Amino acid sequence: MKPWLSKSADTLRRQINSAFPDRDKRSDGWIGDSRHSATKSDHNPALPSGVVRAIDIDSDLGGPANNAQYLANQLRILGKTDKRLAYVIYNKRIASPILFWKWRPYRGYAHTSHIHISFTPLGDQDKRKFKLPILGE
């Protein structure tokens, strides 16, 4: 099984790269490392397909310091209607369908250097762009 990135995850990453061409990518990622493989993580390939349903986007988008929070918040709001999004984690908070996409404390890894975005199986083959104002959509 060869791991591959969800089409929706790939589309969103491309949109972010286009909107922020000079952004820092040091904390970007999608495929889990050995630390992830021992845990339940959307960075691990799903069996039997091999799809990876998560991306990390570095919080330094190359512009105003609050751009990452703005992006995370727009993703949170979009999650209310776009069922391709499973959850968003950023800066010690998580938003998901639990509590209808309201931010709540996250007690796992703090995610202060990057935004974690997980996708549902609905996004596996869906290449539609995400309608986010910060990305010019």
Predicted regions and their residues:
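Secreted/periplasmic proteins that engage bacterial cell-wall peptidoglycan
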Residues: M1-F100, T112-F119
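Short proline/glycine-enriched turn/loop segments at secondary-structure junctions
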Residues: W103-Y109
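Short glycine/proline-enriched turn or capping motifs at secondary-structure junctions
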Residues: Y109-S113, D126
